[in-house]
Amino acid sequence: MENVNLTGQFLVAMPAMTDPYFAKSVTFICEHNADGAMGIVINRPINMTLQDLFKQLNLPLAGALTDKPIYFGGPVQLDRGFVLHQPLQEWDSTLRIDEEIGLTTSKDILQAIAEGHGPHHFLISLGYAGWSSGQLEQELAHNAWLTVEATPEQRHRLLFGLPAEEKVQATMALLGLDFARFAEEAGHA
């Protein structure tokens, strides 16, 4: 699996995945290179809303976004916020994933969201999923994950347009697979 770059793709945990952080998860890969990989789990809302988070940060928030869920992004740096967003715009600390999507960790994006002039589409997580050099490739070789490519429209829908509980099935559908049937039949060839 040398020279494979999964940046901008999705990982779906295989049914045999027992790690509680990743079982039945969909992870969006934000960066993948020789040093390792990092991504955000996009289908695990936690018991916190945008209003709750902004209250903790002393940021006023009004309007329809107050009930927007905050997500568990992965087990690394759980005390830190990560904002996947579209469009890119200019923020203090943004990792450009592609021409449309960025991952920002600076507070200026949260301030802009609170004031109503942040990105149109965003997903906020606490924590991220990280892999050391070669670790993700090894997990892929052991069939821990399915990799899923998506068009920009499909990617936008998976990241920002679907409720969390529909993301595993919708991601698998891009491969022509039904997760429930796949889970039942895995290992019964």
From Swiss-Prot:
<dbReference type="InterPro" id="IPR003774">
    <property type="entry name" value="AlgH-like"/>
</dbReference>
<comment type="similarity">
    <text>Belongs to the UPF0301 (AlgH) family.</text>
</comment>
<protein>
    <recommendedName>
        <fullName>UPF0301 protein Mfla_2099</fullName>
    </recommendedName>
</protein>
<dbReference type="Pfam" id="PF02622">
    <property type="entry name" value="DUF179"/>
</dbReference>
<dbReference type="GO" id="GO:0005829">
    <property type="term" value="C:cytosol"/>
</dbReference>
